[in-house]
């Protein structure tokens, strides 16, 4: 026999022999420890061959069950002490057992028998309760107690048979690590022995380990209650392993002694996952360990690797990008004057529901806000019915993102540096060790079988059902699978699943009965119930019953107009008609709700069954209005309540998994792709995402750089309408018809106010009437964002076309076509364009310009929740369109964004506007070196503070028509073209930025000029075309060559205005000199020209604010500042004031030109200074140009004629960049230049023209090598001449 001890074959023979033992032998031996173990082995062997239901004791074991003596610790210790039982207490019948199992390696006959029995009893939990405690105890304590009696050699091997405390600890360590892998446990024990230097002969072998495993299991099975959830749907091996692991924890804390008290604690530990034991005067908290064996048990497929078990560190915040899911969602947000594309940075530990709540408030329709304020003043009885919206905001994963189902998340920890996700371990879920005690082991092992573990259960404490319900749709499939169901054992799981929710479940603990299935089923009921009954949708908004035309409209409640049209039908359509329509509406599930065909049938049953008895849903689809009126109850509460009640009633809705499939179908069959598809269809709503954090979504999407989510408004699923708590709502809904009628009246009044508030009523009414009768328009909800639909709203990919923008904005919105899909609310926040652009340019035709203030602005709260709210609204019906001017579209006010400034040809010091009037100044530059004619151009000088002209290049659209006899001079013409002469209207350019400037066409410019004073065609006429290189169109006025002019100002004082203007206008308008015409001898760098563009009224800050690049013009540029004062044409400059200007005093420029100069007499423009000035001297003239701010800053320093260069210095004139002058501090430079000019102008005896030339010469000599690329084309013109000659 000794030879057979280690032999596996002998073990098998022993098992067979033990299996053949008769029942009477077992009964006789039952009182002895060996007999007890033999009975265990035989019964369990038999059970292994034919498994019985758990809890049914083996028939032959009726006698062993009541054996109390073995239960006493004294007997056990006595058996441990005695190596050989007395013959009086050991019947002789034990000999066959001893012989049969004597081959058991070191464990004696009992060891082998218990081993065989344990292996077989692994399939059944029923055999275990009958095992005598004493027998199993003695066998576990002293395995070979009866072995030595048979064979003397056994005494030597008794060391093998005894399991010391250390051995047992090692065994349980191995059990924690490897589970029911006896060889691995044996290797673990051998390794530990080897480390301690113990002889190899003391190492337990695999058979001994197996014996000990089963003996210990048999010892504890008697105390485990197998009638509870723990045993249902769970594999026998899983029960064994989990029970032994829990027993090992209990044994570690309080020892292995099992009595009734400890048995209760063991049951509590198994069922709840944690227990508190009073031991040696201390309260010990014992938790079910989350060891690798249970991990394998819960995740047999190995999906959760060891790396995955570690908490995942995620960034603290992640950018989230929200995009509309379809055109309807885009138009809804756009109509609220909000950006449909939203980017934000969110913390990952936030709940998705909080994000949805934020968006819901941010994008609340204005009528919703008004309704909320109004409902505060309405009847208490019916006001609550109206609070629920028909559409709910849902978030969806991005279109291109890949969703991978997540294992369960135990918790998301938020620290200063990281957002850490701790996994849950149960049911293919991972969990941190700290959180395992919060899960009942039954849930850890996936006892819910096919139903899966709802995320809400992760938080539920022991036997409480207060899990953070709502259940997540997301992880149900992932969490659902327990290791027990993933292999061949899924078949028993399927069978056991219905019993979970069956009415015979009361034998379970109450907390478990509720926490598992009800939390599991909460989303199921919500999905299944609400998805297929548009009744809730038709009754969710103020009207409790649906209307015939509304039904199609409310299928997609994203269209604002059906809501308003419906308000009038509330008053007209009889209630019977509405109820009839709700029946027809039942056949058409809403487009927004995506119910798979598999879901429709069960969920319909669920709707009927889950309705409370008080509701009595009607046989067809005709639910009473009362049912629809219950949509105001909190979704979560009602979903939980309905699932609880349906559990007790055993309703079919209980068997629906979160995918809408019956729970009897194991959820592991639901592939991850189907879960992802479900998420893409249903998304996350406020209710289903209550316990879902953004960290989980982030992990699900594969840790992208940014979370790309889509949003849409879907019809409210309305699980609450079939809630069991609906009796109160039923009574509420059965309120008097007058209350309902009053409610509808108030709702209609609200909508009328919303539409009447805006003067564009006719347009909206047409659109509303068209939209209400066109159900096909609802199908546009599925239109891709870029598809052109016949609506005027811009699709998300629309490009901003400035020309269509201008045309659309200028047309009154009443002229817009009544396109059914127009997504304007009754206060059109989008001004629709004309019909010509409505359909053809629907993608790019309408640039949404909010004509009313956004709802969240401080002006938007028109309706204060006062007690006289209804009276005020009725009064508004009559007068709101007149008195509320801020609802009317404002005159177009372009956004004052400082965009990239347009490129201009010269740099100017811009004036700051005075208190009452902004000086619109135009600088006129003379380029007198052209061989054809002296050319110049005008450029308007805009103040950055001038609102009307800010970032709008002034283009001469309309030139004032004047008599031919009083033709304007060139400067006057430039002033008119700049829009600064009071007689000419200031042209406003409709542009949103520099990129959209509409250039003045050549025909317009030429016609305008020639119509004013052109005497005939001229060969030098150059039409004014916008220079495309610059976004600021400018005009260059050519000077006629044929009119020579005399040297000084005083030379021809009698030259009249018409003469010069006629001559000037004969060449028409020409564009600035191209590079081919420009002379190569222009020396001044761009910064010099910036210094020379001296506009007297302008402080230097304006140049900085304009930010236009400096461009050079010529050495001898005369910047004549034209004031925008009153112009009278008949006042010439007094020659006496100009007599001091002598040609001999003018300093020559670097090169002199024989060409006639442009300024020949003071009559070139007699109106270039304010005519109301009493003193026409130069000092008073230029003093009038100085702004008050500049005059306060002026220093009365007298600067010499040659001090320009010394004051301005070469450091300010370096040509490192085109904006080198602007990039420096302009305050000192401009102060010097302005003060120098003032001194110049105050000295009447000095020719101010020569002083200008002197200053220009000194500034240009400083840097002669700089050339301007734009004008350095190499044209062979003559050099620049002195203007005063």
UniProtKB/Swiss-Prot annotation:
GO terms for molecular function: chromatin binding; DNA binding. Residues 13-24, 148-161, 505-519, 579-589 have a biased composition (Basic and acidic residues). Residues 158-221 form the SANT domain. Its main location: nucleus. One of its GO terms (cellular component) is nucleus. InterPro entries: Cramped-like (IPR055315), SANT/Myb (IPR001005), SANT_dom (IPR017884). Residues 117-126, 134-147, 479-503, 792-803, 833-843, 1069-1086, 1141-1156 have a biased composition (Low complexity). Residues 100-116 have a biased composition (Gly residues). The modification Phosphoserine is found at residues 304, 1284. Residues 1-161, 456-519, 579-673, 766-843, 994-1055, 1068-1107, 1132-1172 are annotated as: Disordered. Residues 57-71 have a biased composition (Pro residues). Residues 654-664, 766-784, 804-813, 994-1012 have a biased composition (Polar residues). It comes from the Eukaryota. Keywords: DNA-binding, Nucleus, Phosphoprotein. It is found in: Nucleus. Belongs to the cramped family. This is Protein cramped-like. It comes from Mus musculus (Mouse). The lineage of its organism: Eukaryota, Metazoa, Chordata, Craniata, Vertebrata.
